[in-house]
Amino acid sequence: MQDILIVVDMQNDFIDGALGTPEAVAIVPNVLKKIESFSGKIIFTRDTHQENYMRTQEGANLPVPHCIENSFGWQIREGLLGHGEIAVLDKPTFGSRELGEMLLELEQQEPIGSICLIGLCTDICVISNALLAKAFLPEVPVSVDAACCAGVTPQSHLNALAAMKMCQIAVENE
């Protein structure tokens, strides 16, 4: 059995850049500790937008340019990569179909014992990818480490954790 850690969008723009929050800054040490101590396979996702972001549906609904490909804000926080990750998946929207497909491939190679998600933002991309993992592999236990996540607001973080619990996603370290 293999265990999977998915590190969602731990990018400069979500930590202390265009969409950063004090809560996001505060989880960085927890995220690093979790990555360093994890003995399974690690996959990162990276929110990736283009220069035309403001002309996209997301840009119309969230008119704050962020994670523009190859910008500083798009980069994963220094120090988090380089701990044996097997992939960094760029994604143009909240959930990553490529992540779901990779999880299926990994499951075919060796059964997955657990999937844990950490990162940003709890209420947008973490919940989207947690539900996606549950949809692709409904019999694999999926969890989220709340101490390694932050939402757009503290309340939306709590709302997302409650919603994930209702969908049989375990919440650790609440």
Segments predicted by a language model, with ranges:
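Active-site acidic carboxylates
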Residues: M1-V88, Q109, V152, L158, ...
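Histidine-anchored nucleotide/phosphate-binding helix
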Residues: N30-I35, I127-L137
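A short helix->loop->beta-strand "cap" motif at the edges of active sites that frequently abuts
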Residues: F38-G40, L137-P141
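Active-site beta-loop-alpha junctions enriched in small/polar residues
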Residues: D47, F94, A147-C149
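Internal catalytic-core helix/loop-beta-alpha segment
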Residues: N70-I124
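Short, charged, surface-exposed secondary-structure boundary motifs
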Residues: E98-G100, V152-Q155
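A short glycine-rich beta-strand->turn/loop micro-motif centered on a GG-aromatic cluster
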Residues: C116-L120, P141-P154, E174
